[in-house]
UniProtKB/Swiss-Prot annotation:
InterPro entries: BrxA (IPR014948), BrxA_sf (IPR023137). Keywords: Antiviral defense. One of its GO terms (biological process) is defense response to virus. The keyword Transport does not apply. Belongs to the BrxA family. Pfam families: BrxA (PF08849). Gene3D superfamilies: uncharacterized protein from magnetospirillum magneticum domain. This is BREX protein BrxA. Transmembrane segments: none annotated. It comes from Paramagnetospirillum magneticum (strain ATCC 700264 / AMB-1). BREX systems (bacteriophage exclusion) provide immunity against bacteriophage. Part of a type 1 BREX system which protects against dsDNA phage. This system allows phage adsorption but prevents phage DNA replication, without degradation of the phage DNA. Methylation of bacterial DNA by PglX guides self/non-self discrimination.
Length: 199
């Protein structure tokens, strides 16, 4: 059975760099499933208030990072803030075509047209276009669509493409050479296209 191109799995959280560094560390250590569960639920390495929240957020971050390889995980764990956040961003794009296509089709167009901002209404228009492209896309309630928008716009603030979460002003971002080298060496053409929308 065909899978929908667009899913709501990005709604579980923004890039969460400090926590993603911890998850990348566990992946690099090659922990067993039991060791993973112990670290997340017993040691509470993410410092969450409930085991359920810790499990849910760690699962999202793990699924994101596992779309890439150990070289990128090392950038996340050990890199500078800029390199690490861009490495997590690259993994998030590969993990979620809902995020990737928004960058490629909407954010890129705003930069190309020299428009100064990214109004929230563009997200609603984008979701309508997604449904036209993908008949299998789930029909989401308004609350879910708004939550997804919150998450995507927060990610764009974290990476620097949006400088002000109130006015949604756009800013060009230069992706670090380390991240770009990894993406080129691993032939991540979709991610390369989506991550460089301000060029």
């Amino acid at each position: 059975m065909a899978e929908p191109r667009y899913k709501a799995d990005i709604g579980g959280g923004s890039l969460k760099l400090p926590e993603s560094r911890i998850i990348a560390g566990l992946l690099l250590e090659g922990v067993t499933e039991d060791q993973w569960r112990h670290a997340i639920e017993v040691e509470n390495v993410l410092q969450r208030r409930s085991p359920g929240t810790a499990k849910r957020q760690s699962s999202l971050m793990r699924n994101r990072l596992e779309t890439m390889g150990p070289e990128l995980w090392q950038m996340v764990r050990d890199g500078s803030t800029q390199v690490a956040i861009q490495a997590v961003f690259a993994a998030a794009i590969k993990h979620s075509t809902l995020l990737g296509d928004f960058l490629d089709l909407v954010v890129r167009d705003q930069f190309r047209m020299f428009r100064p901002d990214l109004p929230r209404k563009m997200w609603d228009q984008y979701l309508e276009q997604c449904r036209n492209r993908d008949p299998l896309m789930p029909v989401w309630q308004d609350s879910t669509a708004n939550k997804l928008a919150d998450c995507v716009y927060r990610i764009l603030v974290e990476v620097g493409y949006i400088t002000d979460s109130k006015t949604y002003r756009l800013k060009s971002v230069r992706i670090s050479g380390e991240v770009m080298s990894y993406l080129r060496e691993n032939n991540e053409q979709y991610v390369i296209r989506c991550i460089q929308v301000s060029i």
